[in-house]
From Swiss-Prot:
Keyword Transport part of the UniProt annotation: no
Gene deletion effect: Absence of both LpoA and LpoB leads to a decrease in peptide cross-linking and to cell lysis.
Lineage start: Bacteria, Pseudomonadati, Pseudomonadota, Gammaproteobacteria, Enterobacterales
Function: Regulator of peptidoglycan synthesis that is essential for the function of penicillin-binding protein 1A (PBP1a). Stimulates transpeptidase activity of PBP1a in vitro.
A Pfam family annotated for this UniProt entry: LppC
Lipidation feature positions (S-diacylglycerol cysteine): C27
Chief location bin: membrane
InterPro entries reported in the protein's UniProt record: LpoA, Lytic_TGlycosylase_superhlx_U, Peripla_BP_I, TPR-like_helical_dom_sf
This protein's GO CC annotations: cell outer membrane; periplasmic side of cell outer membrane; periplasmic space
Gene: lpoA
Protein name: Penicillin-binding protein activator LpoA
Membrane topology designation: Lipid-anchor
Amino acid sequence: MVPSTFSRLKAARCLPVVLAALIFAGCGTHTPDQSTAYMQGTAQADSAFYLQQMQQSSDDTRINWQLLAIRALVKEGKTGQAVELFNQLPQELNDAQRREKTLLAVEIKLAQKDFAGAQNLLAKITPADLEQNQQARYWQAKIDASQGRPSIDLLRALIAQEPLLGAKEKQQNIDATWQALSSMTQEQANTLVINADENILQGWLDLQRVWFDNRNDPDMMKAGIADWQKRYPNNPGAKMLPTQLVNVKAFKPASTNKIALLLPLNGQAAVFGRTIQQGFEAAKNIGTQPVAAQVAAAPAADVAEQPQPQTVDGVASPAQASVSDLTGEQPAAQPVPVSAPATSTAAVSAPANPSAELKIYDTSSQPLSQILSQVQQDGASIVVGPLLKNNVEELLKSNTPLNVLALNQPENIENRVNICYFALSPEDEARDAARHIRDQGKQAPLVLIPRSSLGDRVANAFAQEWQKLGGGTVLQQKFGSTSELRAGVNGGSGIALTGSPITLRATTDSGMTTNNPTLQTTPTDDQFTNNGGRVDAVYIVATPGEIAFIKPMIAMRNGSQSGATLYASSRSAQGTAGPDFRLEMEGLQYSEIPMLAGGNLPLMQQALSAVNNDYSLARMYAMGVDAWSLANHFSQMRQVQGFEINGNTGSLTANPDCVINRNLSWLQYQQGQVVPVS
C-alpha cells in the first residue's frame, strides 16, 4: 500500500499541470472579437455575413454585429428589414454603439426619403464626437439630405468630407462640389456669405466666378482655370480638377465644314423634316443671333380658328409623342405683333457658313445603317438627325464614331461621348413648367392632363422634376374629349381642384426612374388633395379648343377666388387668339418658344412666311435654326458644363448626358393683352 503522504505529494505536483492544461484548452476554443475591425470600417462584408455572426455571438459583440447588419441592409436597399432589426436594438448601449445607432437612424431616414427627418437627427450630432469613418458617413448624410440643391451648407459639407476620403472618393467629392457650384445662378452665388477663415471655400467661389465670366469662351476658360490653380495651389480642386473642367482644358472645337443632315423627306413625317431642313439651311446661309430672353407681346389679330393639321406619331418626342403633342395645333393666319425685347441677350451666336458642305440624307428611303455607312464614306464631320425616335434608337445600336446631334431622344438615354440629343417634347415643357411654378413659390400643384399616353408622360415628367426641386406630392386629374368637356359645361358640373397622387416608380440601380407613373382613375371630390392642403397651382396640357372649356369649368366649380394660379403648355397657345378668348383666359400663364414669344421678330416673320403661318411648323423651323447653332457649338455643349445658347426654341443647356434642356418664355393673359410674366 502506498503511503498517503506520497499520494498527496504526487497530487500536489500534478495540480498545476492540470490547471495549465485547462487554461490553455479554454484559450484554444475562445474566438476573438472580430467585429471591431468591421465597426471601424477596415473590413467590410454583406448583411448575410453580419446576421450570421450576430446569431453566433452574445452581449456587446452581438450588438456590434447587429449594428453592422443594419448598416449593410440599408446599403443593399433592404430598408424594411433594416428598420425591423433597428427596432430590436437594446436600450443599454455603450457610447460607441450609441453613436453608431444615431448615425444609422439618419441613414434609414434618408433611405426612406424622409429628408426633413434626417436633417433633424443630423442637427443633434456633433461630428467631432464620431470616429473618422463615421465622420465621412455623417458628412455624406448631410450631402444626401440636401437632395442636390446647391447651398452654402452643402458646400461646407463637401469640403469637410474631402480630407476623410480615399483617392477615388476624393474625385467624386470634388466633382460633386463643382456640380453644386455650377448649378447655382449668378444671383444665388452673389448672396453667399462666408467666414474669413474659410480659405478652401473662398477658393472654390473664386473658381465659380472664373466659370461665370468665361463659360461661353473655352479659350478664356482654359486660361482662367490655369491662373486659378496658381493662385490656390492647396485647394483640393487645384490638385485634382473637377472632371468637367478637365474636359474644358482638353476642349477642341468640332468641325462643321461637312455636315450630314438626316431627315425624313417622304411619307407622313416629310412636312416636318422639310421644315427643319428649311430652318437649318436658312441659318447656315444667313447665320443666327442670340434671342431675347424676355419679350412683351401685344394682342393678336382677331382671326377665326384654323383646322388642326394631321399628326404623326414618333416625331420630335422622346416618348413617342406626335408632333401635335409638343407643338400645339393651331396655325395662324397672321403673326402675333410684339414689342421690342425687354432684356439683354447672351453673346453666343452661330455665324453663317455658306461654304460649308451640306448633304441631305432621306431616312424614309433606305435603312439607317446604310445611310450611316454612306455618311462615313462621304467624310462628314458631324451628323444632324435623325428625327424619328426609332431611327435614333437604331443610331445608338450602330455605335457610330461620328459626332451626332440627334433631333430626338430614345426611351432610355445613353451617355455617349459623341452624341447629344435635341428634341421638342411635351416632357421638356413639363419639366420647365415645374421649375417655373416652383420659382413662383407654389407648394401644391395639380396636373390636368388628357386621358392618353401623352398625359401620362407629362404627369411623370412634371412630378419627377417637382420632387427633384424638393417639392412633395403632385396630384393629377385627367379629362376626356372636347365633347365630354362640352357636356360638362352644359351640365354645370365644372372641374374640382382635386386629384390622385402621382406615384413614381422606384428608381433603378442606375438612379433612373422608370418612364410611367402609377396612375389612378379620375378622382371624385372626396379624393385626395395635396397633403391635405389646397391646390395652389394647376398645370394644364390642352389644345386651345379644350382649354376654352377647361378654364371656365374650373371657375364654375371653384369660383374666381380659388387661390390657384393656372398655367398651360404651348399646346394651348394659338397665334390668332381673338379678344373673347384672351379675356376668357385672364390670368392664365403659358409657355412658348422665345421666337414665337417675340424674342426674335425677324426670324419669326421669316419662319411664319416659310410655313404659311402654321405655328406648329414654325416651331419646327425654329428647331432647324437652333440645330445649326448647336452643331456649331457641339463640343461646347458636350464638354463645357454650363455652356448656354439663347436659342429660338428656348434657352439651351446640356445635362451630363448631353440632353439639351430648354427653358421657355412665359406669357400671361392680362386684360385682353398677352404680356410677359414678371
